[in-house]
Amino acid sequence: LGDVYKRQDIFTGGGISTLGVFALGILPFINASIILQLLTASLPQLEDLQKNEGEAGRRKIAQITRYVALGWGLIQSVVFAMILRQYALEGISEVVFVVQTALCLVTGSMVVMWLSEVITERGIGQGASLVIFLNIVGTLPRTLGATIEAAQTGDRNTVLGIIVLVLVFLVTIVGIIFVQEGARRIPIVSAKRQVGGAGVGVLPTRQSYLPLKLNAGGVMPIIFASAVIFLPVTIANFTKNEWLIRAASLLNPGAANPWPYALAFFALILGFAYFYASLTVNPTDIASNLKKGGVAIPGVRPGSATATYLSGVQNRLTLLGGLFLGSVAIIPAAVERATNVQTFQGLGATSLLILVGVAIDTAK
């Protein structure tokens, strides 16, 4: 399962490979955020806390997220400590080693979580996304160095494979920018009532547009899918269950048969694209606000009909955006395997999506 842990380095900046104090990185916080967002969508109490309690409610949910991140970080820390135990020096108590290592790892993870929250509070950008962005950037020198070294060997197939991969990455970057910036502009018209000395009347209608993004979730579906796909490995290592270990090995991106991993990753990205779109875009609220403001979509009745129309448009847009994200996450990896060029493993399509997406969001 070594290749699975290598993929987790996008959350840790190489921490897992180097086994540093910050080996867990932002991963426990990402997992905790996923759990809380799923619970918020399914539990009325949490949903009410987020929507109706204002800033106090959001702070309460943030506090719950921290506690969940701490708990999940402890579980992952113990798992890693138990894996590392076999490499420890002789004469060290197993219990002492596991406890000390787990405490160091979970403390490092909590420090990273705190830094991400400071970044968010200072208005620099979305903290967790920027931490992952910086982690990926931190691996670039090593990746580029390995690529240059491979090209200098003079092997024709290797050089050709690198050129093909670079072209695929360039096309991918263009596609990411297009999808991240793409939106469906729905025409809307408004007619304001005029009250004055001349009596009551209606001003001429004004037409503008309501933009619905092609990829409403941004890079979050990729980040969430990347985190969730590692959960079976963590659970398998924690329980030592033979069946779970065999099942988790199917999700190894470096396995002889990569299709189970590819299909699972694709399905997770598509699922989280819909999930995150439902969190960021609420057709019912939009329709209600349009109706209150005297704004309508031509040919669509205000109210529930508008909500149904917007929901249908958003679902189609999310399908297109999710299919694109899933394809972009898989195709470059397939090309990498076909060309047998392994130097870009530290900068896969997933990392590229996060780099470009976070850069665009932060620039705004």
Label every PLM stretch briefly.
Residues 18-41, 63-81, 102-111, 129-139, ...:
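Hydrophobic alpha-helical transmembrane segments of multi-pass integral membrane proteins
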Residues 1, 74-88, 140-145, 226-246, ...:
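Juxtamembrane "helix exit" motif at the C-terminal ends of alpha-helical transmembrane segments
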Residues 39-52, 116, 120-128, 181-199, ...:
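Juxtamembrane helix-loop transition segments at the membrane interface in multi-pass membrane proteins
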Residues 4-5:
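Short, small-residue-biased leader/transition segments that mark boundaries at the very start
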Residues 87-89, 93-124, 250-276, 338-364:
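Alpha-helical transmembrane segments and their immediate juxtamembrane interface regions
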Residues 208-323, 327:
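Helical hairpin unit composed of two closely spaced alpha helices linked by a short loop
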Residues 45-53, 83-87, 108-124, 142, ...:
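Membrane-water interface regions at transmembrane-helix termini and the short interhelical loops
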Residues 30-72, 200-204, 283-310:
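Membrane-interface amphipathic helices and adjacent TM-edge segments
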